[in-house]
């Protein structure tokens, strides 16, 4: 079988505003829509400042991983060391970071990690930096990854997603 390569979604992602654009149309991200539908009160009891600090921490961990994968720069953080160990232990072969997928109509999102498991098969992973992985957060991540898998398989003809990982 011929090796399947990931394709560009055509979606422009504005990282600063966290917006997805396909031409003139703004698309919605999956995670927040799922969170609002499944767990609308998930963060209501948490002070805004705490949420901002958690978001900043999550962004820094994601950036640390992305810089390592693109430039082989190891910043020495425990989070990056843990990520490297998890990848080694599970024989994960990096294919892409922050890979944008879309249905081409209404939805788009960035997959944190895409790993190759075969010529036409991929593993997708979401890196979570929650202080505690609750059953609700795990369920939300599973739905999120399932949507990502569906979009990737629609976007990349012939590709299959054979595993979904939550890295926490």
What are the roles of these predicted feature ranges?
Residues 95-168:
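Mg2+/Mn2+-dependent nuclease catalytic core
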